């Protein structure tokens, strides 16, 4: 969690694998770039992906986007830093547009400590498009971009560390791929910056 690391260079634990099923990672362009449930040794390498055409590391800082379902079903029971909205490093928005705007404001506030890092101008629109595409994959049960849920590890993590507590409001995932669940049609939505 970037903001924990900025406050204390020695954090108790990192966010090894995004917990839950209605959760995704986007880069500075608002686009997915990895199977979020890959093991942390493989997924963490995505931070260092270099784009020689743009001469940048587009995934250096990653935005973990999730919905209220994740807050209520996984919450603090994930063996990692808490993802509840009360945490100072959690960014929230009533809509995806609000969330994108609030992420941009947070990045702008942190930019002096991030070497002038900024979001691409396409971030807000791409975030909406990315969530829509992710939701379509979740309903279909197949992640055509990154194959999330096709490997045993993709589902094993949440069964060990992010064991959800389902409720009447947020029942068990009824979709064919247990590692994918559509983000809610309405907010609130949340994000945490990962480094």
PLM feature segments, named:
Residues 1-195:
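Mobile, glycine/GP-rich and aromatic-enriched active-site lid/loop segments adjacent to catalytic centers
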